[in-house]
Design a protein with these regions (language model features):
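Acidic, proline/glycine-enriched N-terminal capping motif
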Residues: 1-142
Length: 142
């Protein structure tokens, strides 16, 4: 089984929970909005609507595309896209993946602990977006 979908807009890393003066923890709005857009994109792309079976190891491939900074010249912006250069600044890859994996908990799979392998990359592109591929891993008997 394999699912491929795109999430439009700038990728948002999973932020740490914030705590109010009274001690209540909450997830920041920006993180919640991104997680909701991931779920919406997943539901729009899914053909059968069935989540991956519980206990099945999954492989996740994530490509986070960022527009080059507006402060760069048009020539430089075009060059980094053409040459396939990758951003080396924030946000961190692990937090970007966490945002997508947590958003799909209970939607695409029972728990993100099922993710047994991942390929994650950041790149520059013309539009901000996130490409997600989730598939079952082949089990080889040893």
């Amino acid at each position: 089984m394999r699912v491929v979908f795109h999430v439009p807009g700038r990728p948002v890393p999973k932020a740490r929970p914030r705590v109010t003066k009274k001690g209540y923890a909450y997830t920041p709005r920006k993180t919640m909005a991104f997680e909701q857009s991931v779920v919406l994109a997943y539901r729009k792309s899914k053909a059968a609507g069935e989540p991956f079976p519980e206990g099945v190891p999954l492989m996740m491939e994530l490509t986070f595309t960022f527009e080059p900074p507006k402060s760069w010249s048009k020539t430089r912006r075009e060059e980094v896209i053409r040459r396939g250069m990758c951003p080396t600044c924030r946000p961190d890859l692990d937090n970007l993946m966490k945002g997508v994996a947590d958003a799909l908990n209970g939607v695409a799979y029972k728990d993100d602990g099922q993710i047994a392998g991942a390929v994650i990359r950041k790149q520059y592109g013309r539009k901000d977006n996130t490409r997600v591929i989730i598939e079952t891993m082949d089990q080889k008997e040893g």
